Every structure is written in structure tokens, then in C-alpha cells.
Amino acid sequence: MNSQSGTRNYGPDKARDFAQQLVKEANASLESNRKMWLPPQNQTPVLPIYYQYVIATSTGYEADQGVYCHHNDEHYFFVSRGRNKNNYNRSVIRKYAVGSDSILNIFIMPHHPDSIQSSNYDVTSAGIALGASVKLSGIYETGKKPWQFKGLLNHEIGHVLGLRHTWSGNDGCEDTPNHPNCWNREKTAPCDTAASNNLMDYNANQHAWTPCQVGKIQMNMANLHSLSRKLLEENWCRLDESKTIEIQDSVVWNGSKDLQGHLVIAPGAVLRVRCRLSFPIGASLIVKAGGHLILDRARLHNACGDHWNGIMVESKGRHEGQITFRGDCSVEDTIW
């Protein structure tokens, strides 16, 4: 967002370069989850984070390459504090959001020029998540590099994906302890030992996701009715045989999954499914001779409005695959 004069934010070329680099830096953080600092001497596992951002184009706006520059003196500014703050004002979103039913919109907005001139107003970076949109400020005025805002972007998108602040109250995760919300580690107490590096705190690092936070994000993405899911690229609709999963041990699946390949239960293996599973068109669930599939209040279907092959039970000599149904189960959208 920029003023009508075009002097309050980056021009088109610089804006596009900045946005692309910011997304690249934020994705790099997603690829390199770090160990939690809190609690001290913790044994919290460091899990991979299985999502990345893609700058999306919308039909009719392909030439903009997913980065749009708007000039509007009424809507371009962000006031993060004071009696005239407009953090929760959605007017800019209502006017300029593109494809908000399936695209996460990031609005980079400068502070109001009157705010900047006030000696009591700190020109700092700030952000807020509002539904499927995020408003960020302090990007242009501070003159910082894109990598310096990757934590801010990941933090606000974390809210969109269902995460809450962790330093006080209950965020729904036992592995994110409360703390005094230090900005960084210091030599004096309490910030010598109580500083956090978690994504959802206000701190100088914001590069650690806990197992619970990763799980909450994945759970929301797998929820057929969630906001998070509407923002995903549907890469589970086409069969990719390289993504075939073979179960070779005793495994229980409790959380919904959208598979991209076949599912094979090897001889001697047991898979207990207690959730929703989606299979792409052309995919099969193969129970090898000696394998055992337990459907425990499970739903097997195709989440793309199409069909999948269904369940194949193989036999070999005196051995054959087994299927056990427990509770209310459904196998839908099969061609067999």
C-alpha cells in the first residue's frame, strides 16, 4: 500500500523484489526449525515443519506476479497504537484483497505520516492477522532488509494457521511455557535464562516451533472446514507414485491425512486408522498377504470430488490380508 503520491512505500519493481526475498527468507526459517530455549535444559524435540509459502497469482491479475501496488490516501497507512490506531480496521482488506477465499493476502503498509512526526510514536515493525489477511507495518520506514522481517511474517501467519501467543495464559500447548517475554538474552535476570526464541513470542529470534505447535498447524490444515485448508495448494489430488507409503511395522494413525500416493501394508505389518484419509485419483490401499488393516471409526475418501481405486486385499498361498472394522467407518468415492 502506498500514498497517492507514491512516496510512502516502495515502487513496483522494488516492492516485487522485496516481497519475493521476504518470502524466500521466511521459507528458509520454516526449513530450519531450531531447538527451544525454554524451559532451560529442555528435551523438547525439534520436528520438521512441512509447509512453505508460494506467491500466488489470481485469475485476471497474472501480470502482477502476485505482488500488487495500490495507491490510496484513505487506506494506505497503519497506526499501531494510540487513540487513532487502526489495527483491526479491515477496510483495506475489503477493498484490495485478492482471492481471499483461497489466497493469504499480506498488506505491507507504512505508518501514518502524522504518527511518524510525533516524538511519542516509535516507528517500529508491527503486524496483525485478520482472517485470511495480514497487515504489516514499519517495513519501508525502517529501511531494514527482508530477512529482518521473516520472524514477523511467520509469527502473523502462525496466527492465521491457528497458533496463539505463548508467554502468558494458555495457548493450548504444554511445551510452550509461560515466561516474562524478554526481547533477547541479557546478562541480568530474568532475561539471562528466561528469554524465548519461539515463533509466537515477541523476541529477536522467532525461529523455534514446538511439536505441539507443528501438530496444531497440521491438524488445522487437515480439517476440511478450516480457514487454513482453504489456503493450501491442493497437491493431494493427483497421484504421485513416488509418494507411496509402505507400512512395515505396527502403526496407529490418529490425525487426518491427505495422501499423495498409494498406501501399502506389508506382510506382518498392522495399520490402525482412527481418522480421515484422503486418496488421490488412481490411488489404492493395498493390504499385502499377512498385512492387517484396522479401520477404527475411520473415513476413507477422495477430498477432491473425484474417485480413488479403493482397497485391494492380496492373498498368497494360505495367507491373505486382513481388514477389521471397528465402530462407524466409511469407505467412499471408490471405483471398485
Go through each PLM region and give its residues:
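Propeptide-to-catalytic entry region of secreted or membrane-anchored zinc metalloproteases
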Residues: 1-97
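Solvent-exposed, polar/charged alpha-helical surfaces in well-ordered, non-transmembrane soluble domains
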Residues: 17-24, 28, 151, 198, ...
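Sec-exported extracytoplasmic/periplasmic mature domains
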Residues: 24-35, 159-166, 222, 226
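Active-site-proximal segment of zinc-dependent metalloprotease catalytic domains
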Residues: 81-168
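The catalytic-center signature of Zn2+-dependent metalloproteases
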Residues: 134, 138-211
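Pan-zinc metallopeptidase signature
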Residues: 212-242
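Extracellular beta-helix/beta-solenoid repeat scaffolds
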Residues: 248-336
